[in-house]
Amino acid sequence: MKKYILSLDQGTTSSRAILFNKKGEIVHSAQKEFTQHFPKPGWVEHNAQEIWGSILAVIATCLSEADVKPEQIAGIGITNQRETTVVWDKTTSKPIYNAIVWQSRQTAEICDELKEKGYSEMVREKTGLLIDAYFSGTKVKWILDNVEGAREKAENGDLLFGTIDSWLVWKLSGGKAHVTDYSNASRTLMFNIHDLQWDDELLEMLTVPKSMLPEVRPSSEIYGETIDYHFFGQNVPIAGVAGDQQAALFGQACFGEGMAKNTYGTGCFMLMNTGEKAVASEHGLLTTIAWGIDGKVNYALEGSIFVAGSAIQWLRDGMRMFKDASESEVYASRVESTDGVYVVPAFVGLGTPYWDSEVRGAMFGVTRGTTKEHFIRATLESLAYQTKDVLCAMEADSGIELKTLRVDGGAVKNNFLMKFQSDILDVPVERPVINETTALGAAYLAGLAVGYWKNQDEIKSQWHMDKRFEPTMEAETSEELYAGWKKAIEATKAFK
């Protein structure tokens, strides 16, 4: 009987189930979108029950369409939108409020108060993160402070907190396992990434009772089994968990110190494996846990770019410059340069290394001769410049010089962008055959735990390159272009 690993990829807008075979190839997949709730400007919420329903639906669809029986599943891996926060009743398993999504800014005031009280340095030291509404801790506090009776129930031990991975493991196991993995715990603002424990001082700062928190476990081990009625009568091991960006780093087989990947989605997330040491950042990066496996924990430096693929969508939908995102490459290639035009797509502020949420988008160097092609090319180039900003910060913090950059996500199909990325970084850019690296990473973590794959060396041998982009631009030219970008950033920051 052929066996497979089932990966559950729970994202910000949809849930997916993907079946992988022994070679790490996709056998079949199913996807289902769910509702985004915007109760107030800047707030983003999901219905956690609807997310659970979407997961059950994609599991059923994927298995039936692939004609795979539940007993053929060797293990389940879970990867998830990180930081998104669910608080539910321990007895009924019902959420007491919507899931507060990572993008949601509804806890910005709580963050300002904590900063004013002087907690920033302590938080930075213990968690590797900044005090920001992005992370889970302030979201839990908000729910306890704003939902009637919640704080009392929490203090009585009747409520549980989890990021989406915890919520799904809880539901799949029928409430038997309340766990999370190191990678997800490291995004909560409540976990000490050095001693690998929930931190009493951080919990006190956020007034979150410890009894609510899940047990933190390695990213690759059997956490529990599915209960019969959720999985067509089968008890399948739930065996791998990692946050989406860390799962992508694992799926790209970036196991060595100094290896890095960049995911070009709505935004960009770049992670560099720093091995078994947590490198503190002096340049606006986050220090995070990549994964815990075989009794060891790997750390990573992470940079976030807020606008990447969404800039291409903006050209298509907002500016109506083309009908299909793939056309952006055709237009950009029609001109030899942007003719001095720079686009800074700071639609929601700037991420790493600037962390400026007040600044807005801008365009520079426009003349009467500027065409649509120049504008499209400049927008695409901005993704590469922002990635270079992050890489410069990573190299400065880690003291490691990048040898190659592995890439994944929607925008990597754009050959113009990948070639320009390689030129501006002056390192080769490698695009893998399997672009679904997030789901693949979760599958690998689960497969290792159940013995489906032997070790990381076997996984490394399965990573195959689709295309390698080599830098050919003169150093002088790329330095000049990047200097122009830095000037554009400074000018953008001045205009608020």
Swiss-Prot record:
Example GO molecular function: glycerol kinase activity
Residues engaged in binding ADP: T12, R16, T266, G309, G410, N414
Ligand binding (sn-glycerol 3-phosphate): T12, R82, E83, Y134, D244
Keyword terms: ATP-binding, Glycerol metabolism, Kinase, Nucleotide-binding, Phosphoprotein, Transferase
Pfam families: FGGY_C, FGGY_N
GO CC terms in record: cytosol
Annotated EC: 2.7.1.30
Record PTM text: The phosphoenolpyruvate-dependent sugar phosphotransferase system (PTS), including enzyme I, and histidine-containing protein (HPr) are required for the phosphorylation, which leads to the activation of the enzyme.
Binding site for glycerol: R82, E83, Y134, D244, Q245
ATP-binding among keywords: yes
Record pathway: Polyol metabolism; glycerol degradation via glycerol kinase pathway; sn-glycerol 3-phosphate from glycerol: step 1/1
Gene3D superfamilies, per database record: 3.30.420.40
UniProt note on regulation of activity: Activated by phosphorylation and inhibited by fructose 1,6-bisphosphate (FBP).
Example of a GO biological process term: glycerol-3-phosphate metabolic process
UniProt binding sites for ATP: T12, T13, S14, T266, G309, Q313, G410
Keyword check for Kinase: yes
Phosphohistidine modified-residue sites: H230
Catalysis: reaction(s): glycerol + ATP = sn-glycerol 3-phosphate + ADP + H(+)
Family of the protein in this entry: Belongs to the FGGY kinase family.
PANTHER family on file: GLYCEROL KINASE (PTHR10196:SF69), SUGAR KINASE (PTHR10196)
Assembly behavior: Homotetramer and homodimer (in equilibrium).
Function statement: Key enzyme in the regulation of glycerol uptake and metabolism. Catalyzes the phosphorylation of glycerol to yield sn-glycerol 3-phosphate.
HAMAP family the UniProt entry points to: Glycerol_kin
Entry protein name: Glycerol kinase
